[in-house]
Amino acid sequence: MKHEILLLGKIKDSFIAEGVEEYLKRLQHYTKVELRYLKGKGKKGALLSTEQEGELLLANVPANAFVVALDVQGKNLSSEGLAEQVINWENTGTRSVCYLIGGPLGLSPSLLARADLRLSFSKMTFTHDMVRLLLVEQLYRAYTIKAGEKYHK
């Protein structure tokens, strides 16, 4: 199974970029994870509207992918719950899972309507860069739980 994370713009903080790279390296042992950075700004550096961001993200979703939208109003899963979800995807033959992380204004209604799962990490607010790190860490944790390894305590 392949996990693809669609992102608007590059990671700005080097310490977060290093953390993301570390977890991507660790995940190679279990599964394929690809980050795709999309240009999140329009002409002259202006931020795109939520609808424009949604259209850009949706246009880049692979065909037949299971779509997970990271949304503060989404479903809260424990780490074990995410591991169970990964197992379920594998058992049902899901080949591609695509995670969508929107810009600072959130996700468009059309994008949320397309999502097969709306996932929330917390009711708290995080920077979009931090959500990227949290996502790859939680995927790594899910795979170690699935493998019965000791990373998860």
Curated annotation (Swiss-Prot):
**Record localization:** Cytoplasm
The record's GO CC annotations read: cytoplasm
Q: Which UniProt keywords apply?
A: Cytoplasm, Methyltransferase, rRNA processing, S-adenosyl-L-methionine, Transferase
EC class, as a word, reads transferase
Q: Give binding positions for S-adenosyl-L-methionine.
A: L70, G102, F121, S122, K123, M124, T125, F126
Does this UniProt record's set of keywords contain Isomerase? no
Q: Which domain of life is it from?
A: Bacteria
Q: Which InterPro entries match?
A: Alpha/beta_knot_MTases, RlmH-like, tRNA_m1G_MTases_N
Any GO MF annotation of the entry: rRNA (pseudouridine-N3-)-methyltransferase activity
Keyword Transcription among UniProt keywords: no
Function of the protein: Specifically methylates the pseudouridine at position 1915 (m3Psi1915) in 23S rRNA.
- Report quaternary structure and partners: Homodimer.
| Family named by the database record | Belongs to the RNA methyltransferase RlmH family.
Tell me what this protein is called: Ribosomal RNA large subunit methyltransferase H
